[in-house]
Amino acid sequence: MFYFNNLVRDVKKELSHYLLDNICKDLPKNITKFVFDMVWGILSSGSSKISNIGRRLFEDNLRVTENRLTLNLMELDLSKVKDNYFHYLSDNLLKLNPNVLIDETDVIKPAGKSFEGLTIIHDASKEGKPREKGFPVTGIVSLTDDNYVVPLITNIYSPLSTGHKSIGDETLKGLNQIVPNIKEGYFGTFSFDRGYDARLYAEYINDKKQFYVIRAKEKRIYTTRKGRMNINQIASHYKGKYSFTYKGKDGATRNAKASAVKVSHKDFKEDFWLVIETIHNENDVRVYLTNIDCSSKEGVIKALKGYRLRWRIEEFFRFIKQEYEFEKFMIRSLKGINNLFICMNVAITFLTSIIQTNKRLWEQIQEVYKPLTNREKEEMLAKKYSYHGINLYRAKNGMQIILGHAKWRPQIPGRNRKKRTE
């Protein structure tokens, strides 16, 4: 038997501490109230749609509520919210030497007409990548000590916007917000997929005294002690100096071998390492660029570990698109959409913080979720998400059930408008 009144009270208390003492600390009352309303609405509705969020605020006129939330999304400056959010992550959840994962995704709006900067992009989720109306999105996430995903940047942009230069420029804007929050004396490892192996990213990370690991394209030509060769030619000379095992995202243990060679490239200022990895029983050779010292086995494994969990950002994209209706927003301005995603990141991180720091409440959320489970559903989740992704899914649905029993949203300390006329 569940005492939902007690559970709702505990969640309200935890959420108030999370937002008022951390995310909205020392911020104006109007911003604090707005962020509180948005995060509460996202958690209790399980959606990023303004209409669903508005219904969970229990106000008299839903249309007025929707207009207020939409107007605030388009007009308020949430940069200080983002700063407080980064400080909270750095102090409470992230590793001291953080693993930062970067990738691009897209938001498809095939029936959209009035969105600011709506452009034509390739829909990567469909076979053949057909051209559709939508927006490109830059995503940057990091991991906790237990490898739970924590969103850092979800930036939607348009090539049609004034001042837009390139995808690389948008990515660097995000990195410029992340790097200063890495504590002095510690070093982040920034993991990029193929397509990011240009000088722009490697030299930026290197200049900031951080580490990078980038999946290399096969067509690149590098200079080694044996001359100029492409990736496949270099890989053919190395059969694997170091042997090791690791667990894939499906949980299976795999045997692999890896070697490392120092190379140079005409576009790069400094030499760097190529790590060549061969997976046993897979006809696949993977090559990574890195500025981590790979002269020893420890360095090679460090570089491979830095990249190994890069697929977690793809899992995060899948989670927000399917569980929070990421592609169904109805906000027209780019600023409003990005402010919506700031609030969504804050809400998702609240779930992660409960899993990581409040074991008693996390156990109660799991107990609430259990009656919903069945074998087929759990097997489906195991195909979609890893162990950590499944836990985040359970936290999201358990939290939605608990807050569904709330009769009103938490009150922000301060002036009560209803008492003004009494």
Located regions from the model:
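Small-residue-rich helix-loop
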Residues: 335-347
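Short amphipathic alpha-helical "interface-anchor" segments enriched in bulky aromatics
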Residues: 106, 302-330
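Domain-level cores of phosphate- or acyl-group-handling catalytic modules
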Residues: 161-228
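Active-site-proximal, Lys/Arg-enriched surface segment
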Residues: 39, 66-146, 257-262
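A short, flexible helix-boundary coil/loop motif
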Residues: 1-36, 40-42, 46-66, 71-73, ...
